[in-house]
Design a protein with these regions (language model features):
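Active-site phosphate-binding strand-loop segment of PLP-dependent enzymes
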Residues: 131-133, 137-192
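PLP-dependent enzyme catalytic core of the Aspartate aminotransferase-like
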Residues: 40, 44-48, 52, 80, ...
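Structural motif of enzymes handling amino- and sulfur-group chemistry
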Residues: 257-276, 282
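Conserved PLP-anchoring active-site segment centered on the Schiff-base-forming lysine
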Residues: 100-119, 140
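Conserved N-terminal alpha-helix of the aminotransferase class I/II PLP-enzyme fold
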Residues: 44, 51-92
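Active-site PLP attachment segment
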Residues: 204, 212-244
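N-terminal "arm"/small-domain region of PLP-dependent enzymes with the aminotransferase-like
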Residues: 1-57, 188
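Conserved PLP-binding catalytic core of the aspartate aminotransferase-like
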Residues: 36-37, 282-288, 295-329, 343-344, ...
Length: 376
């Protein structure tokens, strides 16, 4: 136990010791973009499911007795909604990404990934057997160059391209049209993590890769714990890939299946996304307002999305700014290494339907004042 004490003490000395904190103030921190996590329609769907006997827990792995009608119904509905051949429901986005990256790329393959992909992708790649190469953020040309160099070096396997469609800490968007063309030219597989776009962006909230769904070389991941307000993740892919995951993915095979009640919740969230487009429209109006106001009052160029990073560089300043905003009643968290690269500590402002323009304007006023008064 001493080594754990020593490591925690070292984190404390560097002011990087983390602790859980309560949910306080106006929500500018969560990923509940459409405010579905406690939506009345979601509640009614869950109550109705309980009344008709849907169980709390799955009772086992999907390959044993844990495969429930609700899982299969969700996967069928999700495949139709996203426009893919098949979908597979995992317990979390982390588990799904780990499953994909640890299993699918083979020893002779190459994975070219954006340097800012999620930690779960990195863990999956470390557990996998393929060669993995990072490229500069949003640099499609570097992706093409990396695959060409690998082929010139004698690479014979499958090339894989891994990106997020909307990046969780920067709020910017991957150049998917260019990447899709590069994937086609190299007969590469394109893996797109839609975690922060699902339900919010793309045609009908289907994500930013919606135009490419259904292609044999696309695998997309849609998390269910952000805009969909529930838990889990849906992997969308050709039937062959889904069948391979069912048969070979250890995180899928050896884990208790997600609660059937959560499958019901995700299914209801997808239906709400379809029948209530005004939620997305309201959010996009708030996004446009906040981006304009942030530029006008703080001199900070907005990301254009619902994720607004305020990059201040130093860790101490980021955490002081966060504390000031929290004291004023705004739940905004400071983000620092190792979550983001060294020298890019920031505030991560997330816009959700839990706030309106009035609250957002007041928050930006407080932020502008804090930026002026707190030393750089």
């Amino acid at each position: 136990m001493q080594r754990y004490e020593q490591e925690l003490a070292a984190l404390a000395r560097r002011d990087r010791l983390r602790a859980l904190s309560p949910r306080l103030g106006a929500d500018f921190s969560s990923n509940d973009y459409l405010a579905l996590s406690d939506d009345p329609d979601m509640r009614r769907a869950l109550v109705a499911a309980l009344e008709r006997g849907v169980p709390f827990g799955a009772g086992g792995s999907r390959l044993l007795r844990g495969n429930h009608e609700e899982h299969e119904k969700l996967e069928t509905e999700a495949a139709a909604f996203f426009g893919t051949e098949r979908a597979l429901y995992f317990g979390s986005g982390y588990m799904a990404n780990f499953a994909l990256f640890s299993l699918l790329p083979q020893p002779d393959d190459l994975v070219v990934y954006d340097e800012l992909v999620h930690a779960s992708c990195h863990e999956g790649m470390r557990a996998g057997r393929a060669r993995c190469v990072a490229v500069a953020h949003r640099d499609a040309g570097a992706v093409d160059d990396a695959i060409r160099a690998w082929r010139c070096d004698g690479g014979k396997g499958q090339a894989w391209i891994a990106v997020e469609s909307l990046y969780s800490m920067d709020g910017d968007i991957a150049p998917l049209a260019e990447l899709a063309a590069i994937a086609e030219s190299h007969q590469a597989m394109l893996m797109v993590d839609e975690a922060h776009a699902t339900g919010v962006l793309g045609l009908g909230g289907r994500g930013l890769a919606a135009d490419y769904e259904g292609r044999d070389n696309l695998i997309s991941l849609h998390t269910c714990g952000k805009a969909l307000g529930a838990v889990g993740a849906l992997v969308c892919a050709p039937k062959l890939v889904i069948d391979f995951l069912i048969n070979r993915s250890r995180p899928f095979i050896f884990a208790t299946a997600p609660p059937p009640l959560m499958a019901v919740a995700v299914g209801e969230a997808l239906r709400i996304v379809q029948r209530q487009p005004e939620r997305r429209e309201r959010l996009q109006r708030l996004v446009a307002f906040a981006n304009r106001e942030l530029a006008a009052r703080c001199g900070i160029a907005g990301s254009g999305s619902q994720i607004l990073p305020v990059i201040v560089g130093g860790e101490a300043r980021a955490m002081s700014l966060a504390a000031t905003l929290q004291a004023a009643g705004y739940d905004i968290r400071g983000i620092r290494p190792p979550t983001v690269p060294e020298g890019s500590s920031r505030l991560r402002i997330a816009l959700t339907l839990r706030v309106d323009e009035t609250t957002t304007s007041a928050m930006i006023d407080t932020l502008a004042e804090a930026l002026e008064t707190l030393p750089a």
